[in-house]
């Protein structure tokens, strides 16, 4: 895990925003369905909640970067830790159809703050430069203040993007977090 941030949203829920990098060291096979555990603890070290999510396919030798958010319902965590992805023998697949992270590119074309809403709207597009269609693509927004990650969010584009194709997206993120720059990342997610 590169970074995490904990904030309260407009509903006074405790939202954990994480940014991850994951590498497939295997150069012959894609890896899929790696399980990553998250543990949230309070200031006394007591575990408030544990959860997990599954990594999607990572092409041979590739590194992916993405955001993940989780709402902690059992109190405000003061620390977050993650486990290394766990895999089984069935996690390793033929690499045919696997898209490398650098074969998807995303850009933000507009950031706006609609009147009456407590959200910023990030509009943009993602281009698939791979020779394979991207069946599902995760778009991650990483917000920074003075170069430090202060929040992140993501959405899943479930409409396939054909090879050489482009798709538009809009992501809404709470205005409760002050930022002065952002990154947008497209990650193959199938």
Model-inferred region functions:
Residues 28-33, 47-48, 77, 131-136, ...:
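Short acidic/proline- and small/hydrophobic-mixed sequence motifs that coincide with surface turns
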Residues 13-20, 117-123:
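Short, solvent-exposed loop/turn segments enriched in Ser/Thr/Gly
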Residues 48-75, 151-177:
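Intrinsically disordered, low-complexity Pro/Gly/Ser/Thr-rich segments with frequent PxxP/GP/PP motifs
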Residues 38-42, 141-145:
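Conserved aromatic beta-strand anchor motif in extracellular beta-sandwich/beta-rich domains
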Residues 71-112, 175-190:
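Terminal connector regions
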Residues 99-138, 144:
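Short, solvent-exposed interaction modules
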Residues 22-28, 126-131:
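Asparagine-centered strand-capping/turn motif at beta-strand->loop junctions
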Residues 32-36, 135-139, 180-182:
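Short beta-strand/loop motifs in extracellular/secreted proteins, especially
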């Amino acid at each position: 895990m590169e970074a995490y941030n904990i904030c309260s949203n407009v509903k006074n829920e405790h939202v954990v925003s994480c940014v991850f990098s994951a590498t497939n060291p295997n150069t012959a096979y894609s890896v899929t369905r790696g399980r990553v555990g998250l543990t949230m603890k309070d200031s006394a070290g007591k575990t408030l909640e544990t959860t997990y999510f599954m990594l999607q396919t990572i092409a041979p030798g590739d590194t992916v970067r993405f955001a993940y958010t989780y709402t902690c319902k059992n109190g405000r965590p003061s620390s977050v830790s993650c486990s290394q992805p766990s895999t089984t023998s069935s996690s390793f697949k033929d690499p045919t159809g696997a898209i490398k992270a650098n074969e998807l590119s995303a850009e933000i074309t507009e950031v706006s703050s609609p009147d009456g809403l407590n959200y910023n709207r990030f509009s943009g597009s993602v281009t698939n430069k791979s020779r394979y269609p991207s069946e599902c693509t995760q778009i991650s927004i990483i917000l920074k203040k003075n170069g430090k990650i202060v929040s992140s969010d993501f959405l899943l584009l479930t409409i396939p993007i054909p090879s050489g194709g482009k798709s538009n997206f809009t992501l809404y993120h709470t205005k409760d977090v002050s930022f002065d720059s952002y990154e947008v990342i497209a990650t193959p997610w199938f």
